[in-house]
From Swiss-Prot:
Binds 2 magnesium ions per monomer. Mg(2+) 1 binds at residues 98, 232. GO terms for cellular component: cytosol. One of its GO terms (molecular function) is magnesium ion binding. Coiled coil: none annotated. Homodimer. Anthranilate 1 binds at residues 86, 117. GO terms for biological process: L-tryptophan biosynthetic process. InterPro entries: Anthranilate_Pribosyl_Tfrase (IPR005940), Glycosyl_Trfase_fam3 (IPR000312), Glycosyl_Trfase_fam3_N_dom (IPR017459), Glycosyl_Trfase_fam3_N_dom_sf (IPR036320), Nuc_phospho_transferase (IPR035902). This is Anthranilate phosphoribosyltransferase. The lineage of its organism: Bacteria, Bacillati, Cyanobacteriota, Cyanophyceae, Synechococcales. Belongs to the anthranilate phosphoribosyltransferase family. Pfam families: Glycos_trans_3N (PF02885), Glycos_transf_3 (PF00591). HAMAP family: TrpD (MF_00211).
Amino acid sequence: MSFNISNAEILNILLEGGNLDELTSSLLMQRWLNDEISDVQTGAFLSALRAKGCTGVELSSMAEELLKVCELPVARPNLYMVDTCGTGGDGANTFNISTAVAFVAASCGAKIAKHGNKSASGKVGSADVLLNLGLNLNCSLKKVISAVNEIGITFLFAPVWHKSLIKLAPLRKALGIRTVFNQLGPLVNPLRPNAQVLGVASEDLLEPMGSALLKMGMNRVIVVHGSGGLDEASLQGDNKLVFVEKGKLRFSKINILDFNHENIPNDKLVVSGSDSNEEILKSVLNGSGQKSHKDVVALNAALVLWAAGIEDDLHKGFNKALFSINQGNPWEKFLLLKTYLSSDDLISP
């Protein structure tokens, strides 16, 4: 595909249901980054990509362009790191499960580099609830990176690292639908973690997201689509998984019944706003929360412990995570990170 191809020509390919090759996908993202695509065209591209569905090649190519313009202020930590960032956009209004999972997995020994943002198309994002709990996201990038070594977990606030995409946030919010940027968010962690557990809001995203992460060189990945449409493993029924390991994709499923726990409908995980999210997150992390909340976090944490190489047996990982929750260890991990980041209050290299 020629670099002389126009925006309109690229759009026509998508509108006709065609897939973009690696070069054209990269070019499209470069033009977004260089402000060569208008808001009207952006809306059309986002809608066309959503209607067609993105391929692994399109996603990985666009993600690599975003990572090229995201330079680290210091060397990447020489650690085996895991991310728990998912696509969001499932519309279920559950509490921030993946955020809780990050602290639980860290309390079990995983090194977590959690990439996240404020809400784009949902109600409350991971950054929203962490800010409301007092976590300082306005600190130097060096401090953010060093927290992985010092505490075992860090949070990378996406707009700080991907400033070029801030201008698209109002349009994404106005559209109110899942877009390619929901899919790209989990693929562009600046620390380039070695492994990831990635929740997707649509079953159709399982294969392309797994393929994208495989193409980007991830060691171990689980892409999960939860029963009832959650972008997490749920307690309601069968959860569909794609394992990425040793250069291959493997499809599987898990059900909380396999862990000798009962099925619970997704509406038991729903909250009404950020205040409730804060309360639920804290109660899960300190071990005082509802059984259903603790169980769903432990189930997803088991997936992270597999990705981290800590526990290959998901049943043992589930029990390990649940034990840590009931001991209140994840809340202690959160407080350590909160204290560590509070001593630095200047966004700078």
